[in-house]
Amino acid sequence: MDEIDEMFSNLLGEMDLLTQSLEIETLPPPTRSASTTEINFSVGFKDLNESLNALEDNDLDALMAELVADITDAEQNVATYNNKSTAPFPPADASNSYHFHPPPMPSIITEDLSLLPPPPEFDPHYPPPPPDPLTEPKTQEELESKAKANKINLALSKMKEAKVKKRIVKVHMIDSSTKTLMVEEHQTVRDVLDNLFEKTHCDCSIEWCLFEVTPELQIERFFEDHENIVEILANWTRDSVNTIHFLEKNEKYAVFKKPQNFYMATKGSADLKDMNEKNKVSLLEQSFCGASVTVPELEAALYLKEDGKKSWKKRYFLLRASGIYYVPKGKTKTSRDLACFVQFDNVNVYYGTQYRMKYKAPTDHCFVLKHPQIQKESQYIKYLCCEDPWLLHQWVTGIRIAKYGKILYDNYKTAVQRGGLASHWSTLGSSSVSTAAGSSQGNGQICQNVTTISSSFSDAWKHGEANKQEKKSSEVNKPETKSATPTVTKRPPPTPRRASSISRVTDHPAFPPKPKAINTDIMSGPPQFPPPEPLQPADDFLPPPPPDFFDAPPDFLPPSPPSFMSNAENPPPPPVTQLQMSNAPAPPPPPPPPAPAANVPPLPVKKHPPKPPKRQSIVGPMPGTNAHGGAGGQPDFMSDLMKALQKKREPPT
């Protein structure tokens, strides 16, 4: 029996080897591999159990004869099947089948393939894909069931919302007013602070906090930003008189502003106040962002209140990450001798107020450790007293760091980020509101002096307008000077011409100092004449050349040239000036040298801008005055005066 089994296993192994070689040569599709092995295994046998039973009765020779007969039949069937199925198969497969068909051994395995149905990949007709459930039209029952499911989901969501715990919180402001808020159970203290920032329009500083006050125990503390305010309020009793205040406390995040005061104060560092921002950040990262949070090393002698008594005992306490430890009497400060005073898992730290009066404490700088659910005096409350306020601040901050760890640092970074965004948006939103500094509003906060965009824009606009006005004024003054110079330059030419004409008429280059008195008389004589147009440019003090100003007095003299004397009865002053002006360009003789030499020295003395234009303005009316004087019946007086002046000017013989 063992020999038969061994021969049968050898036969099956040979058939497997033939199957593998056929797969390598013909490269059939991968989907046929499993089925071919199964058929190869069952070739010549309808039932494996029956064949095994038959092996016991039949001898090996008969079995081999049957196997050879089956192999020949299979070879014939494969040959006929390949002849029939060459057309639908690809030419490559057909050529391979023709090429590998003649050998007898591969035909044994191809018989197995002939028993399989055609592979699905060669079937040109595939079944249609299943319809899309989204695009498939739904029946009325399906629509009704879907609507019912939606209603059930909506009802469940509303039930969940109804189960959310909500509390009405009354927050006390600085000016004794209150704000009422609706707080849900998922809201943290940070969310409530952001809500209060929007309502009160404060400066969104990180020092703002919610401050819990428990009057019955005379304790108080500020809530941490990550705490759930609904859970905190759930610990209060129904008849509790505890209050929540919206205050600004610098102690909340002082450790992150000056970490050297808490982590390096006990090391005797001398440059605590001179630490730069980079070193501060590195110290904070090292203390809070490592594998474990570094708790400040605090060791001090504190006063402990005895249970049920108003007496205090001095003990030496040490702060560790797991809690507060103290040194028992007669023991050292080694770790094995330390006794655990309290752990921070289920306690909060509070500030004590007026404990010197209530419990006869050595100082008023006390802090309390108690469970949050304890709202009345109990033996489980721990009272500790410090000698100075700075030591109290160090211990309370160290306990907070040991209890909350890195969460405290995350709260600080979140407060800084939100505070910056809130202040930015509040500044943009308050551009339309401007109130006086220090005035109290109805929201319970003191108005802050916030520089709005509108005010800064108006200031910038005013500054720009002022600069524009200065530029315009400078530009306007420049063209005026340019326009004034030609008007003044136009005025000097007549004066030298008149002086030259007078000199030619009188044959004298200069006059004695008497013309000054004559000038005053003439100026006071005709007040009815309007001033000429070039008065305004004369106010700018752009005088003509010096000789022109001091040659003008001879024009004001009453005596006129001989042509004037001959035409005294018909005085046409404008034509005379026109003739002078018209004749002036043709003969432009320079003034005689003595006249400018004599007139140059008084320049600094007679630098009065109004007088030169007035003298020039009277040049035109002067002949008119003479004409009017002659018409008044006084021509003889004028002629006598002219003769007297000529006699005085004649050199003595």
From Swiss-Prot:
This is Amyloid beta A4 precursor protein-binding family B member 1-interacting protein. Pfam families: PH, RA_2. Residues 462-481 have a biased composition (Basic and acidic residues). One of its GO terms (cellular component) is cytosol. Keywords: Cell membrane, Cytoplasm, Cytoskeleton, Membrane. Residues 82-141, 462-653 are annotated as: Disordered. Signal peptide: none annotated. It is a peripheral membrane protein. It is found in: Cell membrane; Cytoplasm, Cytoskeleton. Its main location: membrane. CDD domains: PH_APBB1IP, RA_MRL_RIAM. Residues 605-614 have a biased composition (Basic residues). Appears to function in the signal transduction from Ras activation to actin cytoskeletal remodeling.
